[in-house]
């Protein structure tokens, strides 16, 4: 599934990339929605 709202992959130093939530119990990972376990 593609993210309904695409992830912002902006790395600042050693911070993790910013992630925007997908709908319905899914999460954004590598610009794809994966099941949030």
From Swiss-Prot:
Taxonomy of the source species: Eukaryota, Metazoa, Ecdysozoa, Arthropoda, Chelicerata
InterPro entries linked to this entry: Hwtx-2-like
Localization per Swiss-Prot or TrEMBL: Secreted
GO cellular component: extracellular region; host cell postsynaptic membrane
Organism domain of life: Eukaryota
Family: Belongs to the neurotoxin 12 (Hwtx-2) family. 02 (Hwtx-2) subfamily.
PROSITE patterns, alphabetized: HWTX_2
Name of the protein in question: U4-theraphotoxin-Hhn1v
Keywords: Disulfide bond, Neurotoxin, Postsynaptic neurotoxin, Secreted, Toxin
Disulfide bonds: 3-17, 7-28, 22-33
Molecular function terms from GO: toxin activity
Free-text comment on this protein's domains from its UniProt entry: The presence of a 'disulfide through disulfide knot' structurally defines this protein as a knottin.
Tissue: Expressed by the venom gland.
Function: Postsynaptic neurotoxin.
Major site of localization recorded for this protein: secreted
Record Pfam families: Toxin_20
């Amino acid at each position: 599934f593609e993210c309904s709202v695409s992830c912002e992959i902006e790395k600042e130093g050693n911070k993790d990339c910013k992630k925007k939530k997908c709908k319905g119990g899914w999460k954004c990972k590598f610009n794809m929605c994966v099941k949030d376990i």
